[in-house]
Structure formats: C-alpha cells, structure tokens
C-alpha cells in the first residue's frame, strides 16, 4: 500500500510540472520546469540559512524581498556538496522556496534567478504580497570567468558609482570585475609607502603635473580610492559573487607615474621643443633596478589589498621605441643576448610575476606581453587585439580570456552616427550575442584553454560627455551586457538572435526597475507615397520632432509630408533611449570645397590637404600656443543649418585646442567672435548668413601632445 502511495505521488508530481520555455531569464538556465501553483511572498516570511558563510547572501536577498533573514524560514539557502562550483538548483513550491548551490557562487546564482522570477520591482522597492509561479530550475555556467573591465583612469568614477554598477553586473551573473586603476591619465589606488602616487596622480589639470585629457580642461579634476575604499568595494562585490581584479598597467601606459617620478624613464633626453617642455614618454625603463624596487613596494600593497588570485600587470601598447634609444636598456639587451625589445618586455613581466609569486598571486597580462618570450605557465592572458591573438595564446598553452575588441569593447560605437570609438568595429548587442568559440575558429585543443569572456569599457569618451549624456556608461554597456552574460553562461554552438531579442524585450522591464539608461534599437522609419511613419517593437514610446519648426511631440500616427527629411524620431522608455532615426536625407551632409590654413606648420605626411579631401585628419607639425589659429575658407559661401568645426580625433577630444574661441566671417574679410570652444570644437546652429570662413583661435599653451589634429568640417544643409 505504501509503495502504491509513493507511485501515485510521483505520478502527481510529473503531472504537475512540465518543461517549458523559460520566462525570459537572462542568462538562460539549462533547465526550467514549470509546475502548478504559486508561492506567495508575504511580509511575515524569512530568508533562512543555517550556514554562516551564506548569511551575507541571506541578508542580501532579504533586503531585496522586503523581509528579514534568520536561521529558519520559508526561503531556504543551502550548500550542496554534490553540485559543482557555481551550479545551483532552485525549487519554488507553494509553501516554500529552496535554493541549493555547490558553493557560495552557486547559491548566489540561484538567488539571481529567483529574483528574475519575481516582479521587476524587486530591484527597487518590492511591494508585498508578491507571487512567483512554482517551478524547478537546474543550472550551471559554461565558463567560470564571466567578466567586465571598467576603466576608471580616463574618467574618474566614484566608489559609490562602482558599487552601483556591481549590482547591475551581479543581477546578470557576471562574476569578475577588473578595475583598470593606472594609466597615462591617472593613478587611482592609494599606495601608503608612496602616498604621492594617488594624492597627486589621482588628479590631472590645474596645478597637477599630469596634463588634462578628455575633458575638464580648465580645472584640477579626479580622485582616488583609499585602500579602505577599495576593501569596501571588494567586500561589497564579494557578497554579490563578484571577484574584483586590479590592473596596474606596466611597463607602458605609465605617463601619470612618469609625470610624478621622471626618474623611472629611460636615460636619454628627448626633444621637447614641439611640446613646450612636456615629456610625453610613458614607459618604465626596463634596466633601472630602482624601478623594480619601487614596483616591489607597489606590488606588495596591491597584493595585501586584493584577495583575488590574479593581479593584472598590463603589458599592452608599450612604446618600446623608447628602450631602443636608452643606453641602459641596450646594454641590458646585449648582456641578456636579446635582439628585440619585445624580449626585454618579457624580461620585465617575468620580474614582476616573480614579485607576485612571493605573495601567492598569479600574473594576468594583455596579449602583447607573451610576444617576446615565455611567461610563467600560470599566467592568465587577456586577448584584446583580435581573434588571432586569442587563439595564439590558447595554442601556446596559456589560460585565456577571449575579449577581442570587435566583439567585446563596449566603448565602441553601436551605429555609425552614435558616440564612441570605431577602431575595432561598430556593433550592437547582436554581434556580441553571435559569438561562439567554434564560429571564431578555435580548435578543440584551443578551446580547452579558454576560461571565459570579458567585455570592457575604456572611458576616454566618457569624461567629455555633456550633462544630458551622464548615463553614457549605461548606454554603451546595456543591452550588450545581456549578450555577454548569455554567451559566457550558456553552452551552445548556435545562437537564435530573434529569440534572444524577444527575451531582451521582456527583460527590459527589469532594466527599467534597475534604473539602467540602456540603449533601445532605433525606430524603423518608412516613407512611402508621401506618408512618413515610424515603428518600434520594444514597448517604447516614439517621439517625433520637426527640426525646422523645432516642435516635438509623442508620435501617434503617420505624417503626410513632402519633406520627410525634416522629421527625426527617437524611442524612449524609462531611462532608456534610442539613437535618432530618420530618412537618409535628414543625415545628409555637404562637402563644399575649402582651403585649410594655420599659423602652425603642417605635418609632413598628414598634410592639410588630407582634411580638404574630407573623411581624413590633418595634423600640425607642433603643438599649439596662445594665439595660434586654424582657418577654413570656403570657395563659395556656405548656406547651412549647422556646421561643426573641430580639432582633435574623430571619436574623442584629444590632440585639440583645449581652450579657445571661434570666429566667423560672412565675407572672407571681417571676422566676428561667436563663442568659446567646447572640447576643441565649435558648432554653429542656424547661422544667419552663408559662411565664407571659420577660424578657431587657441587661448592656451600646449595640449599634452606633439601636434594638433584637425578634422574636416561637418556641414548639414538647410531642410
């Protein structure tokens, strides 16, 4: 009779549960089984665990659920040694919830999934009672390293902002945060044995020896993390199953350090005439023993602060040409039998790796660091330059993080007219989502050495964003972060972009609740038979503006017009927004003939004629001084609705007139001042007359570089 009862219960359970498509959980779990009934979360419920290790996690979940944590309760967190690391089992029953994990990370992953089953307000202020459909979830990640790198050097990002971003990563099961703490622009971590590194090196501009870059040209600006700050970030992230990995970028990208300690540089005197005495060298001399003494102090303190296994020591974009001019480096190369400076870099990295080993740490490096010779076998290599470099690292036997820029650099543009870089690629979420190691050409043996994926956000273009774009970090990284989370978690050699897009749209309500100012896909704009319309499929509201009358409103119905180019559309929902969408005529630009002249001599190869051809940069042969000017004179006066005249690179404000003003001439003879430059450029909106010439005048000495870049003008016609 007892056996019959057990069988009946088993049949009932099988009838009560069924495998169905998961309810838009990102990343997608291995198995989601829907069951009959629901769990009703009440204020009287408790998150419970008997494990001291899991109590911080119980408190974390209880805070999100608006309940208390205790050793007994209705939502139970447990360790299960039969499960692997980060593996979990989640059971939602009518009377209780059980989350079991193979370790702390596994239980956390179950908690993150459980939160995605609750109403979206769980991420801000969950109202009780709340219901969750009964279900069973079995899940584990494909890769143990699911990372994101945040550059806090080019743009200072506060401790509080980092911790807020940690939450966003944790909600999506990203488990590594690499902080890019040192670079040419700043030194962000307190080193108590050398306090000047952060106290001076954390700031640039003003009376700082570090030249201003990427914005904030006229003020001393920045900050740094005390060791107490960093320990607070580490502890906060640890509760959320995120390991914080520091990067101290060596031996290159060290201009900030060199600005404070020029003695670290190679033993030769460069020509500084073109930079008004500012030394732009950025690489540690590899031959000076005093440098290794300084770095030993730094490494010791970094290892004491961070509890991670790996310390990233850089190795990218080292200007080894400086070593070729250094008598000490050349002598060391001869002594060691080296013929290439890349071998000297490997020597440098091995010495730093030996220091790390003394403190029980292992080195992590950028892919260039393995080009010049063998590094320790336990080195973790981050392949950023391309797929080829990732495959080479794995083939050499190094554990490898796959992060080629054309798929994983989230500072890249998402379409050609949006802000960001474009040197690696222009891509949105779909390109990242499409990545599999098989599709990238990794062999079975190479795949064995891939331990995960990482995306990155280098922040050069962040500091100069205008106030209305203060959420640039969110916009650039979401929803691309959802793609990263998915491919780093799910074991699959095929991708269904349409299905995942539908998952993302369902997930947008959660991004809204998290307060993420993510990027929406632009509305689809159609003009047929004199009727202009716009469509969106993501639940957003579409807004339309007539750029001639400057009247904007919510788009509700198609527009009958003979001038479709006068209308521009954007989509918004919550804090999210899309790029502009319009018929192609709206984006059309003019390319009138012009002559470029300057008080500064032109570069020998990047001549002024390059800019006159449009689409290419010109350069001067020296940096700028007070009173220097650049003039654009048009063959015929240009009538337009907008004209942008800019110094600097196309994608970010570097090699610019840091301070200055613009003058306009309508007759080619008389110039009038129209305003100050912003980040090296001036934009003329609706000029009252056709423009014959524009002149940019510099009002500050130098720009931290050896030249000024000059862009061709961008000119929009009247509509």
Tell what function each PLM region has.
Residues 1-24:
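Bacterial Sec-dependent N-terminal signal peptides
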Residues 363-368, 375-379, 385-533:
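Flexible, acidic glycine-rich loops studded with aromatic residues
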Residues 502-619:
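Low-complexity, disordered linker/stalk regions enriched in Pro/Thr/Ser/Gly
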Residues 19-141, 364-370, 509-513, 600-601:
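Acidic, contiguous N-terminal accessory segments
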Residues 83-310, 351, 355, 454-461:
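Feature activates predominantly on carbohydrate-active enzymes
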Residues 696-704:
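Short beta-strand-plus-loop segments that form exposed binding edges in beta-rich domains
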